[in-house]
Amino acid sequence: MSSKRASQYHQVEIPPPQPFLKSLKNTLNEILFADDPFRRIRNESKTSKKIELGLRHVFPILEWARGYSLEYLKSDVISGITIASLAIPQGISYAQLANLPPILGLYSSLVPPLVYAIMGSSRDLAVGTVAVASLLTAAMLGKEVNAVVNPKLYLHLAFTATFFAGLMQTCLGLLRLGFVVEILSHAAIVGFMGGAATVVCLQQLKGLLGLHHFTHSTDIVTVLRSIFSQSHMWRWESGVLGCCFLIFLLTTKYISKKRPKLFWISAMSPLVSVIFGTIFLYFLHDQFHGIQFIGELKKGINPPSITHLVFTPPYVMLALKVGIITGVIALAEGIAVGRSFAMYKNYNIDGNKEMIAFGMMNILGSFSSCYLTTGPFSRSAVNYNAGCKTALSNVVMAVAVAVTLLFLTPLFFYTPLVVLSSIIIAAMLGLVDYEAAIHLWKLDKFDFFVCLSAYLGVVFGTIEIGLILSVGISVMRLVLFVGRPKIYVMGNIQNSEIYRNIEHYPQAITRSSLLILHIDGPIYFANSTYLRDRIGRWIDEEEDKLRTSGDISLQYIVLDMSAVGNIDTSGISMLEELNKILGRRELKLVIANPGAEVMKKLSKSTFIESIGKERIYLTVAEAVAACDFMLHTAKPDSPVPEFNNV
């Protein structure tokens, strides 16, 4: 390398200047339209074709309906009926969990699936209510309004919270701000969902033990205290019946997991439990007074509820808070589920379009007596395994639910509440993903800490504390990643021009007169002081080592900036300050491999003038060769004679 001639060094070019508005437009396009959603429309010359493509983009049903076949219809009908058999008992159960009338669970499986079938981009997502959002609704609304004492206000606030959730989801999608939801890391979601599932299971002990009075708190200590303080109120009939159905449900889940072709056994088991539980109690309710049942469910499809929305103080802020928090959680779950099944079938879904679809189905749902819905994993997994081809399976499910609402609701009168509790517990146990937690422990201890913190926050605190911990630790992790970028010493891989981390490649060769440091991240206000201090420490350690070994003293500090995607004014000030500090120590700063954005910023400052263009190189290899040239043929201050432009 040292024999490389000066004329072979390449000068790092400064990117041509761009008008501010054009630069701003490009930046916004990268942030908001990274997937270039209007590419097909932009490349079309005919106005009518552009309108058609635009409508197909907004309403995906127009896209998949064009090639729809009888074979697809057969698959979607089977899938729709299958998920309806799961949606009906789950809907009733989750409405109970949210402290809402059971009929709302059926209402929420009618309108939202129809809206999603028109606007949703996932072929496999099955829309409905979910346990975590139901529990959040109950926990947050229940703090201010008692569902038993003031059921009408509680119901109206649930509709209003659903409206605000839908409005927030729609706005995020329209403004292309989907990345906001991604602030929750995978580890945080695993911990939060696991904690919420644990809390839901604990809450269901009320139904399993036949208790009439129960705590509104969700932390494990208060719940267990409430359970054992009422041990004299436990109903053995309820407990035995609940355990029998729970064992049945878990057995069918185990069979379906071991033999995926028998997925329908697990899918049908909740409905089978409801049917057998209802028949059992219908004939034996006189003998088993301790078993509570649903009672009357009103016949008919969804009544309008737009006039019931509450937009007046003091409750509007409560509904807004509940709507935003539950909406974000539901959105994160729905998009994650949709993407996972899209990956299995090798197609893509548009996250921003999904947000708009979720938002519209919740807005319209709030107008038609529905509470918050999203794409639950259990229902979507059944839909996927049943062989669905398009979102029409949601329409079939909605039709089946409508038939139930119009003609079959009286049949649920004697459905035992303990059966609904068993259905919820069986569904929630699958959300405690211990395998994912073990994987996090093996892969990344910090991610495991994030997961554990979120879990413990929910279980021993409240849902809100768990959510705050999940977001807070995720943000802290993000700040640590960017605010404390890695800096490591690089060495030369023998007989090559490749330079790598010497800790990763111990055989890499270092030079006594050169210290090559790689900065692994952007340089900006949050990390500039840290980088300056850390670089200073590396230099001190290197000089101490050279002093001890008696080698040639340190002459050049080469900063490899290949991973520095951007730099701000604080970062530039740090480089200028570092150059002055090194100058006082008779050391020379050399920059290698700066990116276009970095060079553009540096060219507008005084840094290049102060350091000199002759100390900025295209690659680390050329920077090292130039330093060798100056060390062996000239004084350290001497510039490299010539550069070739690239």
Curated annotation (Swiss-Prot):
Membrane topology reported for the UniProt record: Multi-pass membrane protein
Q: What is its main location?
A: membrane
**What keywords sit in the KW lines?**
Membrane, Sulfate transport, Symport, Transmembrane, Transmembrane helix, Transport
What are the cysteine partners in each disulfide bond?
A: none
Which GO CC terms are listed, alphabetically?
Answer: membrane
Q: Which NCBIfam families match?
A: sulP
> What's the protein here called?
Sulfate transporter 3.2
List the gene name: SULTR3;2
